[in-house]
Structure formats: structure tokens, C-alpha cells
């Protein structure tokens, strides 16, 4: 068993999730984790790039540099907290910060910032990054990548297991006995809810969904939001902030007398029902499980609404299966680093649409 570090900064832009795991590729144990905050100014600068308000190459290059230092500092903080030497770590798997993902364009591309040369040089640890573009070079979406890891953890169930990750975007992995893994992004997760509460209350997220719970669902608005053509597209598919953001959302609420808390309730229901519309297709009998991870697993009202819409499902978090729901994605990128170091496949072509299996990622040596 070797030790790997996983670094994840998702579409919620709420900081760096850092983990150390021990793995041989088939078994993975979480040894420890740390959350490392992102400077508010860096978050604001990133949001400007992600929403297209800032396209200056000099600014983007500087953010790439700043993020490299942030990820390196998160790594050193984690090692110090757990009293583990950098020499004990085989490699770091760094997802980077996605600022644009365009898999369906004439010239498909994805862009993650966070200079891995800086991470490797500053920590003294070989770093694996740029996980998505090899899959895209093979005709895939480059996302989601986590279903391959979910299959390692939860694969071959007797009944159907649906692993639901709710970060800024929601994605699902469908695990069924004797069937290929299915996985794709269902649509928004916390992203729109977080943006809305930040704009109206100055808070970074809606704790427990309390503000959404205080509102009433606006059916007219909900139905309009669900007309987005993304939801009718067949999988494999993936999405991000470039499709679902407040600028896109503004067209539906302009000059409407909606109360902010009612809009929040509707955004939560938008997330829930676009998830449910997808997962219900994979129900088998009355023994289907929905295992939730990511930040959305802490939103009590959201979890209640999922159970409401899926009365015959067992809805729980992955914590109930001894897998930390907060660190699933960071653990996945530690595992992806292991796969790359050993030249093992780490994508699921049935999930991403790639033409074949491949070992994803580029190695940035420390020396």
C-alpha cells in the first residue's frame, strides 16, 4: 500500500479539500484530511474568469500561479497536521480549478488552473494533474471521472446503488451488478443556491437549507428552468458554471415580483427534481439505494426533498457506508494519481464516451 495525496477545488470555490489515503488501487483507506481556505480575493478573481467577465491572459496566468501556491500550501498544511513526511508520499493528485469546460464544442477543451510545477517544486512530491484532456482527446467528455472510483469502492452490488455527488454541479454513478458503470452530470447542485444566497444575504451557502425551507416553490419558475436543453440530452454528458449561472438565471426572474426566499426554495427544488428525473430511470424493484456525498449531503432540507420524491428508495449519505461524504472527490483524485503512476486505466468509456480505457493525467516530477 502506498500513500497518496488528493487535492480538490470544485465549482463551489469554497477552498481546497486535501486528503491523504493509503491504496493499492483496489483498496483505499482515508488516513486524514484538511480543509484549506481560499483567499476571498482569489475566489472573486476566479469567479470573474469562470463567468467570462475576465478573459485577460495575463490575469489568467497569474491566477494559475496563485492557485499553484494555494494547492502546495494546502498540501504542506495537511502533512504538518498529520505529522507525515513528504518523503512518505508517492504522489499528489491535483484536480486543479476548472474555469471552463466545453466538451461539445467544435474544438472541445477543458481548462483547469493551478500550476502543478509549483506544487511539485514547493512540496518535493511528484504531482499528477491534467486528468481530463486525455479522455477528451479520445472523444470523451473528460467528465465525470469519479464514477471509475465509485466503481472501485461500491462496485458489483447485489442491488442497484446510485452514488450522487452534490457539489456545485450534481453527478451520478449508476452501479448495477453485471452492467457497465453509467455516470454523468445531472445539472446544478449547490452552485445556483450558493450564488443566490450570497447575492441576497452575503452568506456563502444556505446552512441546512434553512432559507430554502422558509420559502415556497414557484412552480412557474421551476418549470421554466427545467426547459433547458441540457436535461433532454442523452448521456454521456457533463456541464458546469458556463451553462448554469446567475447570468443565465436572470432572464427568468427579471421584472418578476418573486420573494428571494421563494426563489431559493425553487432553486433547491430545481436541483432535486433534475436529479430525481434522472435517477428514477435506474430504479430496480424496491431495493435501490441513493448514497449522497459532497457538500449537498449536509443540506438537510435537500436530503428530505430527495427522500420525498423517491419514497421507495433508501436515501442516505456515503458516511453510512464508511466513506467520508465530504472527501469523496479528493480521495478520487488521490486514486487517479495512483492509477497514473502505475500506468493503469482510470476512465470509464461508457461514462465519458471515450473510445477506450486510458491512464489519465500528466506527471510533474518534483526533481
UniProtKB/Swiss-Prot annotation:
**Keywords tagged on the record:** ATP-binding, Carbohydrate metabolism, Kinase, Nucleotide-binding, Transferase
Q: Which organism is it from?
A: Aliivibrio fischeri (strain ATCC 700601 / ES114)
Q: In which pathway does it act?
A: Amino-sugar metabolism; 1,6-anhydro-N-acetylmuramate degradation; Cell wall biogenesis; peptidoglycan recycling
* InterPro entries documented for this protein: Anhydro_N_Ac-Mur_kinase, ATPase_NBD
- GO MF annotations, alphabetized: ATP binding; kinase activity; phosphotransferase activity, alcohol group as acceptor
Return the HAMAP family for the record.
AnhMurNAc_kinase
Its function, per the record, reads: Catalyzes the specific phosphorylation of 1,6-anhydro-N-acetylmuramic acid (anhMurNAc) with the simultaneous cleavage of the 1,6-anhydro ring, generating MurNAc-6-P. Is required for the utilization of anhMurNAc either imported from the medium or derived from its own cell wall murein, and thus plays a role in cell wall recycling.
- What protein name does the entry list? Anhydro-N-acetylmuramic acid kinase
Q: Where does ATP bind?
A: 10-17
Identify one Pfam family in the record: AnmK
Amino acid at each position: 500500500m502506498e500513500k497518496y495525496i488528493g487535492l480538490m477545488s470544485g465549482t463551489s470555490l469554497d477552498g481546497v479539500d486535501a486528503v491523504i489515503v493509503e491504496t493499492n488501487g483496489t483498496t483505499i483507506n482515508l488516513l486524514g484530511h484538511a480543509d484549506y481556505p481560499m483567499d476571498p480575493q482569489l475566489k472573486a478573481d476566479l469567479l470573474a474568469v469562470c463567468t467570462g467577465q475576465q478573459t485577460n491572459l495575463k490575469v489568467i496566468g497569474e491566477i494559475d500561479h496563485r492557485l499553484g501556491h494555494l494547492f502546495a500550501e494546502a498540501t504542506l498544511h495537511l502533512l504538518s497536521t498529520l505529522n507525515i513526511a513528504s518523503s512518505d508520499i508517492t504522489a499528489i493528485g491535483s484536480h486543479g480549478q476548472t474555469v471552463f469546460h466545453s466538451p461539445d464544442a467544435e474544438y472541445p477543451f477543458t481548462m483547469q488552473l493551478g500550476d502543478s510545477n509549483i506544487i511539485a517544486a514547493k512540496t518535493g512530491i511528484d504531482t499528477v494533474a491534467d486528468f481530463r484532456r486525455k479522455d477528451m482527446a479520445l472523444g470523451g467528455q473528460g467528465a465525470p471521472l469519479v464514477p471509475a472510483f465509485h466503481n472501485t469502492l461500491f462496485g458489483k452490488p447485489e442491488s442497484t446503488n446510485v452514488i450522487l455527488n452534490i457539489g456545485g454541479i450534481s453527478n451520478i454513478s449508476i452501479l448495477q451488478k453485471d452492467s457497465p458503470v453509467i455516470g454523468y452530470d445531472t445539472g446544478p447542485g449547490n452552485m445556483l443556491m450558493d450564488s443566490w444566497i450570497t447575492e441576497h444575504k452575503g452568506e456563502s451557502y444556505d446552512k441546512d437549507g434553512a432559507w430554502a425551507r422558509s420559502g415556497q416553490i414557484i412552480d412557474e419558475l421551476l418549470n421554466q428552468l427545467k426547459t433547458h436543453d441540457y436535461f433532454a440530452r442523452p448521456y454521456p454528458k457533463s456541464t458546469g458554471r458556463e451553462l448554469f449561472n446567475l447570468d443565465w438565471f436572470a432572464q427568468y426572474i427579471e421584472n418578476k415580483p418573486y420573494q428571494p426566499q421563494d426563489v431559493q426554495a425553487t432553486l433547491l427544488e430545481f436541483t432535486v427534481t433534475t436529479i430525481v428525473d434522472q435517477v428514477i430511470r435506474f430504479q430496480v424493484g424496491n431495493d435501490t439505494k441513493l448514497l449522497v456525498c459532497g457538500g449537498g449531503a449536509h443540506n438537510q432540507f435537500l436530503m428530505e426533498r430527495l427522500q420525498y420524491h423517491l419514497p421507495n428508495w433508501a436515501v442516505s449519505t456515503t458516511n453510512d457506508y464508511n466513506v467520508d461524504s465530504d472527501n469523496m472527490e479528493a480521495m478520487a483524485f488521490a486514486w487517479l494519481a495512483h492509477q497514473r503512476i502505475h500506468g493503469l486505466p482510470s476512465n470509464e468509456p461508457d461514462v465519458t464516451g471515450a473510445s477506450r480505457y486510458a491512464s489519465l493525467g500528466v506527471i510533474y516530477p518534483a526533481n
